[in-house]
């Protein structure tokens, strides 16, 4: 029993908080992204497209993202 108490005391003294805070870090980092970035990343995952279709969709997605960015700038 003494070994367990010593290990516990060492852990508490180390200041390490354990795995429970890692989830918070993941949620904070994912919340900082925006939905346009997510759409682009998901579009890149589609493996059923040919090269021509992929380029066409990428161009249309980039254009719509730029239009949304310009609209946001004009609103502020």
Curated annotation (Swiss-Prot):
Keyword annotations from UniProtKB, A to Z: Acetylation, Protein kinase inhibitor
Site (Important for inhibition): 16, 19-20
TM region positions: none
GO molecular function list: cAMP-dependent protein kinase inhibitor activity
Disordered: annotated span: 49-76
GO (cellular component) term, any one: nucleus
Modified residues annotated as N-acetylthreonine in this record: 2
InterPro entries hit by this protein: cAMP_dep_PKI
Family classification: Belongs to the PKI family.
Note: The inhibitory site contains regions very similar to the hinge regions (sites that directly interact with the enzyme active site) and 'pseudosubstrate site' of the regulatory chains; but, unlike these chains, PKI does not contain cAMP-binding sites. The arginine residues within the inhibitory site are essential for inhibition and recognition of the enzyme active site.
Function in brief: Extremely potent competitive inhibitor of cAMP-dependent protein kinase activity, this protein interacts with the catalytic subunit of the enzyme after the cAMP-induced dissociation of its regulatory chains.
Protein name: cAMP-dependent protein kinase inhibitor alpha
Organism from which the protein derives: Bos taurus (Bovine)
């Amino acid at each position: 029993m003494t070994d367990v108490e010593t290990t516990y005391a060492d852990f508490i003294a180390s200041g390490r908080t354990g795995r429970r805070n890692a989830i918070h870090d993941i949620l904070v980092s994912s919340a900082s992204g925006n939905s346009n970035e997510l759409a682009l990343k998901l579009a890149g995952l589609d493996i059923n497209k040919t090269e021509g279709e992929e380029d066409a969709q990428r161009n249309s997605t980039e254009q719509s993202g730029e239009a949304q960015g310009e609209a946001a700038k004009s609103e502020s």
